[in-house]
C-alpha cells in the first residue's frame, strides 16, 4: 500500500458517512482530514431539488465570497478606450480586444476569468467555441458582460465564484483553502448557500436544498446538517 493510499484510508476512518455534521464540526473535520503536501482547496457540492433539463429550473449566478479564495485570480478584460483604462486601474491582468482574440485563437489561455463590455461581444463571439467549453465565456447573468468593468475586475480579484447547476441537479464550487481559519470557510460556505437560495427558480417545487457535502481536494466527503447551515443565513 502506497503512502498516499494509507493517508487516504486514515482520513476516511475519521469520517462517519452516515452522520450529518453541524457546520462548525464539518469544517473542522475537512481541515483535519486533508493530508496532501499542497494547500488543498475546500469544495462544496449542493444537491438541489431542480431539473435543469427544464429552462425554468436552471440555477446560475455568482457570489463574491466574503473571505476570498486564497489564490491570485488572473483577470482578462475585452474593452477599449476609457473602459480599457478603467479595467487596468482596477487591477486587470490583461486588457485588449482583437489582439487578445488572436492570442486565444492560437491556444493561449493564461487567465482564470474573462470580462467584456457589451459592445465587445461581437468580437468575443468569434472565440465563443474556445471560451465556452472552458467556462470562460463572458455572460451577463453572472456579471461578466458589463460596462462597470472596474467593479467586475475587483469582484473577480476578491474571490467571486460563478455557479451553475449540472445535469444531476448538483452545484459544485470552491470556498477557499484548508489553510483558511475555520470561521472564514464557514462564512464563505454560508455566503454560497445564501446565493443559491436567492437564485431559487420559481418553478422549483418541494425541497430545494436536498444535500450539502464538503471535502478537500484529496479528502473524503462530509455531509452537513442543512438546517444548521441555513440557520446562519
From Swiss-Prot:
Coiled coil location: none
List, alphabetically, the InterPro entries matched: Ribosom_uL1_bac-type, Ribosomal_uL1, Ribosomal_uL1-like, Ribosomal_uL1/biogenesis, Ribosomal_uL1_3-a/b-sand, Ribosomal_uL1_CS
GO annotations of cellular component type: cytosolic large ribosomal subunit
Alphabetical list of Gene3D superfamilies matching this protein: 3.30.190.20, 3.40.50.790
Identify its protein family.
Belongs to the universal ribosomal protein uL1 family.
Alphabetical list of PANTHER family matching this protein: 54S RIBOSOMAL PROTEIN L1, MITOCHONDRIAL (PTHR36427), LARGE RIBOSOMAL SUBUNIT PROTEIN UL1M (PTHR36427:SF3)
Q: What name appears for this protein in its UniProt entry?
A: Large ribosomal subunit protein uL1
Source organism per entry reads Trichlorobacter lovleyi (strain ATCC BAA-1151 / DSM 17278 / SZ)
Q: Which gene encodes it?
A: rplA
Amino acid at each position: 500500500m502506497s503512502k498516499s493510499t494509507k493517508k487516504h484510508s486514515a482520513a476516511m476512518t475519521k469520517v462517519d458517512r452516515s452522520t450529518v455534521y453541524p457546520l462548525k464540526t464539518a469544517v473542522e473535520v475537512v481541515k483535519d482530514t486533508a493530508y496532501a503536501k499542497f494547500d488543498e482547496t475546500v469544495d462544496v457540492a449542493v444537491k438541489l431539488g431542480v431539473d435543469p433539463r427544464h429552462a425554468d429550473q436552471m440555477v446560475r449566478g455568482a457570489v463574491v465570497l466574503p473571505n476570498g479564495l486564497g489564490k491570485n485570480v488572473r483577470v482578462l478584460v475585452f474593452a477599449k478606450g476609457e473602459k480599457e483604462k478603467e479595467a487596468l486601474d482596477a487591477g486587470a491582468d490583461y486588457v485588449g480586444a482583437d489582439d487578445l482574440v488572436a492570442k486565444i485563437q492560437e491556444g493561449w489561455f493564461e487567465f482564470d476569468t474573462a470580462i467584456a463590455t457589451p459592445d465587445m461581444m461581437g468580437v468575443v463571439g468569434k472565440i465563443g467555441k474556445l471560451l465556452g467549453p472552458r467556462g470562460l465565456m463572458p455572460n451577463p447573468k453572472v456579471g461578466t458582460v458589463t460596462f462597470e468593468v472596474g467593479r467586475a475586475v475587483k469582484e473577480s480579484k476578491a474571490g467571486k465564484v460563478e455557479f451553475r447547476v449540472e445535469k444531476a441537479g448538483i452545484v459544485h464550487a470552491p470556498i477557499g483553502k484548508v489553510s483558511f481559519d475555520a470561521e472564514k470557510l464557514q462564512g464563505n460556505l454560508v455566503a454560497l448557500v445564501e446565493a443559491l437560495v436567492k437564485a431559487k427558480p420559481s418553478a422549483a417545487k418541494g425541497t430545494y436544498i436536498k444535500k450539502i457535502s464538503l471535502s478537500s481536494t484529496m479528502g473524503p466527503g462530509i455531509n452537513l446538517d442543512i438546517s444548521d447551515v441555513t440557520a446562519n443565513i
